[in-house]
Amino acid sequence: MRLLWKLVILLPLINSCAGEGRFSRPIFIQEPQDVIFPLDLSRSEIILTCTANGYPSPHYRWKQNGTDIDFGMTYHYRLDGGSLAISSPRTDQDIGIYQCLATNPVGTILSRKAKLQFAYIEDFETKTRSTVSVREGQGVVLLCGPPPHFGELSYAWTFNDSPLYVQEDKRRFVSQDTGNLYFAKVEPSDVGNYTCFVTNKEAHRSVQGPPTPLVLRTDGVMGEYEPKIEVRFPETIQAAKDSSIKLECFALGNPVPDISWKRLDGSPMPGKIKYSKSQAILEIPKFQQEDEGFYECIAGNLRGRNLAKGQLIFYAPPEWEQKIQNTYLSIYDSLFWECKASGNPNPSYTWLKNGQRLNTEERIQIENGTLIITMLNISDSGIYQCAAENKYQTIYANAELRVLASAPDFSKNPIKKISVVQVGGDISIECKPNAFPKASISWKRGTENLKQSKRVLFLEDGSLKICNVTRADAGSYTCVATNQFGNGKSSGGLVVKERTIITVPPSKMDVTVGESIVLPCQVSHDPTMEVLFVWYFNGDIIDLKKGVAHFERIGGESVGDLMIRNIQLGHSGKYLCTVQTTLERLSAVADIIVRGPPGPPEDVKVEHISSTTSQLSWRPGPDNNSPIQIFTIQTRTPFSVGWQAVATVPEILNGQTYNATVVGLSPWVEYEFRVVAGNNIGIGEPSKPSELLRTKASVPNVAPGNINGGGGSRSELVITWEAIPEELQNGEGFGYIVMFRPVGTTAWMKERVALVESSKFIYRNESIMPLSPFEVKVGVYNNEGEGSLSTVTIVYSGEDEPQLAPRGTSVQSFSASEMEVSWNAIAWNRNTGRVLGYEVLYWTDNSKESMIGKIRVSGNVTTKNITGLRANTIYFASVRAYNTAGTGPSSLPVNVTTKKSPPSQPPANIAWKLSNSKLCLNWEHVKTMENESEVLGYKILYRQNRQSKTHILETNNTSAELLVPFEEDYLIEIRTVSDGGDGSSSEEIRIPKMSSLSSTGVQISKPSTQSLSMVGVFYCFAIHPLSR
């Protein structure tokens, strides 16, 4: 009873401190580590680090060799934060084991143990060392004998005054265990003084011993002898986990012994093992359990062998496998803690509370790594440590035990203010006050105590569960919690909503690629609740906010229909519509099958190929939900334009046919094949092409066409044809066979033309008469044989040039730029040469040969008009006949002088008068220059404004009268006429159409500029009359 009252008094403190969790235990973030300190006067202070977190901040204590350090009694030790500073350290006073303790109101923790040692090495004694005398070929050991020291040493030797260390090899070895220098067999070059150098790495100091002289004895050379092992490793070695182990083995002997190693249990040497150059050192890095066992060193030479062996024993300091964790328990509960650590040897366990060792007593049971405390009370709160220890190390696991005692409290975990449930659903209202020990729970609805029933259940954890909720269950509910320290209560409301129902779910659909569909998803729900629609496709959410292609949500608040536009094959699958409210999640699923053209067939193979056929096989691709009904085979060659459908056997390839023979191929052509599948929906994508293969060769079966020829020189027969394209040549070694014979004979002459590109053959024979007819046919051949021949065609041999010149040649000038040449036709025969036409040559006196004009006319034409000549110039002309062989002799030249140039000045001062449909024109006579032809008359050119047809009126006078209907504007110009041709035209005059009024006009032109200078209206009588 006294304890109960004490707890009541302590409750405020417990709640504000432990219960509220404001205090936190110390946790080390830095612990002291082992230190080997160099004994050097320049180093005046040692720092052993120790830092811990916690609230309030911990204070620190230190132990040396298990005894508390009293910082008030000496300045030698001081606290630096939580770290220990040792000033002017001394070996006799400060060497030992140190531990840091961190304490706050929650408790105390003890750090790992840290060892402080001092590294040093003294000087060698200065006395002279004795001379070592040996025979040549004998083995010898030079002792180093290091001075007193602490810390790891390394050894090296020098020879005479050389600054370089003696290099180790199969004959010489420096032991890093003893420092001694070993010679397996002494040679004359070894004679001299040897000095041992010793370095202490931790003390940062090296010392040098006195020299040891080595001399050779004079009483002979040492004979051969078997190896004697002088450097051997211990029989038993303790090897720590992950450490690097080195075993030394060296032997004296003559000849120099070879060193080798093995494991006595027959296991292979680990691959990680390293050897020194001489094999005298075996190193095992990162030593593990599987590396332990017996190792043997073998030293051998021609005289025998010797052995050394030892055992490596694996050990490991403790490592945690299971640590203890912070635990918060109610008063009178029981504590069970267990910690486990691995190690070799197995560790033992010790338990500590606030840095003090725990022992078994009435309520406390300790067995190996387990701790049990029954009937917990407040005084059991604190920091506990499990220490796992073997002879190599001690490790600590730390945790806090907090024992709690309080009346029920809802401040941190009150009843939910509003709980919402749907009609027909189940609801659980949690009641979890903080109470130590656990409180008993009762419930009220409104002001009435609630009793259990089939629908109303009180759960073990204190929660209230109501099943198959109705509207009448809505209201206020209160949880009342009680323990020996007091009671507490908390209330919340229950709101009941109508259920949500999917009224129109999506249903299974069969659609075709490219269509658009709507999947319905419509619900009825409580009007006070928001509804969220989410669609899934094959398990993945459709994110409509990102504007995913094809998908669109349509509908209002209670409608979540999904539209799929331009549906594709990849849209086949399961569509899940989920409807979410704050209370529940409903879903409905539908399968959508999208049918489309078949996928591309696969694995198209050419099983066999001949000259005109190919056997193919393939595997069907996906039918895309519509059975394949037909296959089509297509081919492509280097000569085709794209892919072409081909004939097959069988002719129709139904959807169950997966092989066929392609027929009608061209021999000796490279083909690719592909297969296309079709179904009710359409034609699918083609397969990948097969490998490129060439059909077998065959005799060519297409004869050349368009057999022709003729021409060429005398005694030549020229034969031409259309070349056969490569795809019809049917094989290698392709060429042409040309066969011909004179008409009326029976024997064929036969020639081969090996050039594939050739389309012409010329046969020469002096006996061939001009224009002799020949029967000609052309065939083809290749390495497989001769193929088809063309039909017979008549081709004439070459002919002679015409032998006769034309007679009766004459020439006449028509204008300043035109003349006409005439001649008599030649009556030709086979002897005088065939005439196909005539060639007219013309030139001037000073024409160069390259400037001679040539014009040809064909057939029996005997005149030729030549234009584009120069005015007032003498031209010469002659005529000659031509045929396919060339041109014949020219006629005698004739000449003519072209007319002078036509007048250069146009008619000027043109006046006009328009009356009804009569137009009166008047202009000045044109005067010509000396080098121009005389004016013989004038041409009047007129046309309606919107028409292209021009009318011409010629006159010898300087006036004219035109009768024209003037429904539209007229355009008029006037030019001169002379022997030299038409002269320059006046500027175009526009005569406007007139409806009722008469009008007159004048155009004044300067002869030099021909520009319009004035337009006016005048009376016709002022310039009259047009007729004389």
From Swiss-Prot:
- Where is this chain lipid-modified, annotation GPI-anchor amidated serine? S999
GO CC, sorted alphabetically, is:
parallel fiber to Purkinje cell synapse; plasma membrane; presynapse; presynaptic membrane; side of membrane
- Alphabetized Gene3D superfamilies for the sequence: Immunoglobulins (2.60.40.10)
What start and end residues bound the annotated signal peptide? 1-19
Which UniProt keywords are given for this protein, alphabetically ordered? Cell adhesion, Cell membrane, Disulfide bond, Glycoprotein, GPI-anchor, Immunoglobulin domain, Lipoprotein, Membrane, Notch signaling pathway, Phosphoprotein, Repeat, Signal
What does the UniProt entry say about where the protein is found?
A: Cell membrane
| Oligomeric form and interacting partners | Interacts with PTPRG.
Q: What does the UniProt function comment say about this protein?
A: Contactins mediate cell surface interactions during nervous system development. Participates in oligodendrocytes generation by acting as a ligand of NOTCH1. Its association with NOTCH1 promotes NOTCH1 activation through the released notch intracellular domain (NICD) and subsequent translocation to the nucleus. Involved in motor coordination.
What family does the database annotate?
Belongs to the immunoglobulin superfamily. Contactin family.
What is the name listed in the Swiss-Prot or TrEMBL entry for this protein? Contactin-6
Q: Which organism is it from?
A: Mus musculus
